[in-house]
Structure formats: structure tokens, C-alpha cells
């Protein structure tokens, strides 16, 4: 009942002025009442943003597809790396002018210190981390404030990461004030202790990703990992947004299949083959058997004659449950970060076990034995490959970790690529809206990063190993 009331409140917020405007109108939306309670603004920012980052387009059709968690079984253009420019424009503009605009409004108005301010800083860092990981250089220091600039400069990823790490450290130190987050907290239901752990864990994610680029990041990461109680320490503390058990405000992947009538994706052959080779107990959760009773993944970029019956559909827990959660960060990921940063085999095995437990299965001795032997032979490859498996359902993070490390190495250019020889796309294409609104700064960023005329291939991201 509490969840239903929260989502009814969200509908009220959306219809009372949560509409999106052009990039240069952030913080000046005349349809957004200035006296809306901050908890309502937080609710809108979290709901709109997470539904976008974990929705069918950004999560499945692009990031999750290019990370080869999923494969297209019809309308497979994106599996050939042909993209729709309006999709990337919608995601880029939608994150800036919706959730980030709302969060900046909270930051401008919330008492300092306060739990509300800390939550807004945390979610702002979360969204910006995804934006820069997908697009590289983006507006950051001059963004979200038209008083500073209506044509904000594009900042280097090193600048953005440093700012996000600072904000997350500030947020973690601030949680524990007396103010109530109210009904707007769709992540932890007002538990600021868990919010603090999420802020610290997200900081660990960013520090780990860039530790080889900045010695101070590596030092800060080791200090953070030395205090595991300050991080997500169990599956009960996972950062996730759940949905009411109805078809109206449902899990966006469920909504895409049942409300929109789309069934364009299956699990990838890359995923199924890797899980089968190690007898992974999560396979029945991630995938459905085909009509012949077998687990068969769809080869990325390939047209199958009878894909709806011959290959495995996405597991029911992810696609067929209207109340299924969108997961932002997990205990398993924290353990994999520790395993990589500290060369800790036990943390790696614990991460595998935590991911299995998250999905209601047991990591048996035989499975852990296979995984342990793989670690002994190739530690980093094993850690990232299992991290990629644990990230199923979080396409953006899986895509980022593959681009950072090159693992799993089973992910390769599809045979029918529209850009043969270029490999897997290195980035999302910049939005067409910026060509008209911020052309000079956009073109300078494109030149600095070596973005070619496809828009999706460039120099490696700053954090590439």
C-alpha cells in the first residue's frame, strides 16, 4: 500500500509540472511550481531518471545490446551498430532537462546540511557518471545553470570524475541529519544509513574505474575499502528502485513488452554460452528455455529464421514482473571492486556468491571451484567477467566495464557490422540537439576525442585500461 501511495504521488507530481524543456531552459521552467515540496521533486528526479537509464531503449537496445547481454531478434539495426539519432538525443536531453534539472533545484533550495541535499548530490553524481561514461566529454561545470551559460563548455572526463567523487564524499558525510526524505525516497524508503553506504559505494565504483589515471584516486579507494561497514555490505542494502505490482507504473522492461507490445530482445549467445560453460546457476533466472527445452542464446547481429521459438527469451524476473526492481548498485559489485583493487580472491568468490544469492540461487562448491581456478589463471579477466555476469540487467554499467577492460573477451564485433573492422562501438553518439544549441563546444569536444563520422567510434574513454 505504501508503494502504491508513493507512485500515486509521482503521478501527481508529473501532471503538476514535471514536463521537460530545452537544455537552455533548465531551472527556468515556468510550468514547474516553485513551491513544490522537495520530497516531490526528489521523487520525480529518481523515477524519471532511473526509468530512463534502466529502460528498454538506453538499457537494452543500446548499452545492454552492445555489451552483449541481449541480442535483437527483430528490427536488429542496433545489433549491426546502426542507431537512431533521436534515441540518443532523447536520452541525453532527457537526463539533463528532467532529473538533473530537478536535482539541481533541490541542491539550490535544500538546507545545508540535510539528508535531502545529500540524496540530491548522490543521485546527481549517479546520473552524471552514466552520462560521461556513455558520451565522454559532456557539459558539467557550466551545466544546469543558465545564469552561468546557455552554451556550456564540454568538460574532460577527468574533471567530471573529480567533481563527482567530491560530491559523493560530501554527501556521505552529510547523511544522518534530522530531516525526513519523505515519500520521495524510492530507493531506500527514508533509510539514510543505507543512502550513506550507497554514496560511498558509488564513490568506490568511480575511484576504481579511474585509479590508474590518478594516484590520489587509488589512495582514496584503498582507504574506502578499508572500512567495509561504510559500504553496501549485504543484498538488503542494494540500491534499487522497485515498482508497484500493477501494469500502470510498472518495471520499464515489463512495460515495453506488455504495455507497448514489443518483444524485440532475447538473451545473447555470448551470455548463454559463457554461463553454460561454467554451469552458472543463475542461467535459469537470466533466461527462459526455448520451445525445445534448451538454453540457446541469440547470436548478436544475426537473423534467425524462428527466433521466438528457437532462442531463449529474457528471464521472467527481469521482463515479466511488473514490480521487478531497477538495480543501481549491489553488494556483489562492491565485492568485485574490492577483488580488483586489492587482488583479493576471496572477495571475488564472495562477489559471485552474493550475486547468486541476490537472484535466489546458491553458488555451490563445484561452481565456486571452477570460478576459483579461473581466477588463479587470469585474475582480472575472471573478476570482470563475473562482474559482467552479475551486472545483467544494468546495461550501462556492463557496457562501461567491457570498454574499460576488454573483458569478457568473448564480446567481439558482430559479423554483420555496418562498420566492419571498427570493433564494438566505443560510445553513444552526441545528440542532434547540441548541434543546433551548442555547436562550437560540441565540435571542439568531438575533435578532442577523435569521434569519427559514425558518431559511435572514437578514441578510448579516459578510464580505458
What does each of the following model-derived ranges do?
Residues 57-62, 286-289, 395-404:
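Short coil/turn segments at secondary-structure boundaries
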Residues 19-67, 75, 79-82, 94, ...:
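Membrane-proximal, proline-rich intrinsically disordered regions
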Residues 3-6, 47, 204:
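Hydrophobic alpha-helical segments, especially transmembrane helices
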Residues 35-39, 70-364, 376-380, 386:
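Structured, solvent-exposed acidic/aromatic patches
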Residues 352-356, 363, 368-465:
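C-terminal functional modules
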Residues 1-28:
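Bacterial Sec-dependent N-terminal signal peptides
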Amino acid at each position: 500500500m505504501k508503494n502504491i501511495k508513493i507512485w500515486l504521488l509521482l503521478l501527481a507530481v508529473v501532471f503538476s509540472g514535471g514536463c521537460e524543456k530545452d537544455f537552455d531552459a533548465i531551472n527556468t521552467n515556468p510550468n514547474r511550481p516553485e513551491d513544490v515540496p522537495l520530497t516531490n521533486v526528489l521523487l520525480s528526479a529518481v523515477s524519471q531518471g532511473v526509468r530512463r537509464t534502466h529502460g528498454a531503449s538506453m538499457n537494452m537496445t543500446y548499452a545492454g545490446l552492445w555489451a552483449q547481454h541481449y541480442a535483437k531478434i527483430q528490427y536488429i539495426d542496433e545489433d549491426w551498430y546502426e542507431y537512431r539519432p533521436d534515441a540518443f538525443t532523447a536520452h541525453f536531453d532527457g537526463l539533463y532537462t528532467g532529473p538533473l534539472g530537478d536535482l539541481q533545484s533541490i541542491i539550490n533550495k535544500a538546507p545545508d546540511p540535510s539528508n535531502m541535499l545529500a540524496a540530491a548530490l548522490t543521485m546527481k553524481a549517479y546520473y552524471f557518471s552514466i552520462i560521461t561514461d556513455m558520451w565522454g566529454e559532456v557539459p558539467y561545470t557550466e551545466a544546469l545553470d543558465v545564469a552561468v551559460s546557455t552554451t556550456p563548455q564540454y568538460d574532460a572526463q577527468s574533471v567530471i570524475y573529480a567533481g563527482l567523487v567530491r560530491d559523493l564524499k560530501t554527501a556521505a558525510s552529510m547523511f544522518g541529519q534530522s530531516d525526513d526524505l519523505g515519500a520521495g525516497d524510492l530507493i531506500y524508503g527514508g533509510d539514510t544509513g543505507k543512502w550513506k553506504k550507497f554514496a560511498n559505494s558509488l564513490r568506490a565504483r568511480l575511484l576504481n574505474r579511474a585509479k590508474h589515471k590518478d594516484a590520489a584516486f587509488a589512495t582514496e579507494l584503498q582507504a574506502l575499502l578499508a572500512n567495509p561497514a561504510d559500504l553496501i555490505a549485504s543484498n538488503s542494502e542494494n540500491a534499487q528502485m522497485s515498482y508497484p505490482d500493477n501494469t500502470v507504473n510498472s518495471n520499464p522492461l515489463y512495460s515495453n513488452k506488455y504495455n507497448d507490445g514489443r518483444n524485440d530482445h532475447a538473451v545473447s549467445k555470448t551470455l548463454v554460452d559463457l554461463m553454460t560453460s561454467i554451469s552458472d546457476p543463475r542461467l535459469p533466472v537470466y533466461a527462459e528455455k526455448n520451445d525445445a527445452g534448451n538454453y540457446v542464446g541469440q547470436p548478436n547481429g544475426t537473423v534467425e529464421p524462428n527466433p521466438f521459438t528457437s532462442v531463449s527469451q529474457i528471464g521472467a524476473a527481469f521482463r515479466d514482473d511488473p514490480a521487478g526492481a531497477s538495480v543501481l548498485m549491489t553488494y556483489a559489485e562492491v565485492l568485485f571492486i574490492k577483488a580488483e583493487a586489492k587482488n583479493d580472491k576471496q572477495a571475488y568468490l564472495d562477489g559471485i556468491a552474493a550475486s547468486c544469492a541476490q537472484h535466489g540461487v546458491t553458488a555451490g562448491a563445484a561452481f565456486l571451484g571452477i570460478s576459483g581456478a579461473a581466477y588463479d589463471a587470469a585474475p582480472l579477466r575472471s573478476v570482470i567477467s563475473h562482474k559482467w555476469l552479475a551486472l545483467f540487467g544494468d546495461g550501462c554499467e556492463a557496457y562501461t566495464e567491457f570498454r574499460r577492460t576488454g573483458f569478457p573477451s568473448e564480446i567481439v564485433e558482430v559479423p554483420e557490422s555496418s562498420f566492419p573492422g571498427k570493433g564494438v562501438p566505443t560510445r553513444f553518439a552526441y545528440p542532434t540537439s547540441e548541434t543546433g544549441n551548442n555547436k562550437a563546444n560540441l565540435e571542439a569536444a568531438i575533435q578532442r576525442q577523435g569521434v569519427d563520422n559514425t558518431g559511435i567510434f572514437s578514441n578510448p574513454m579516459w578510464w580505458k585500461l
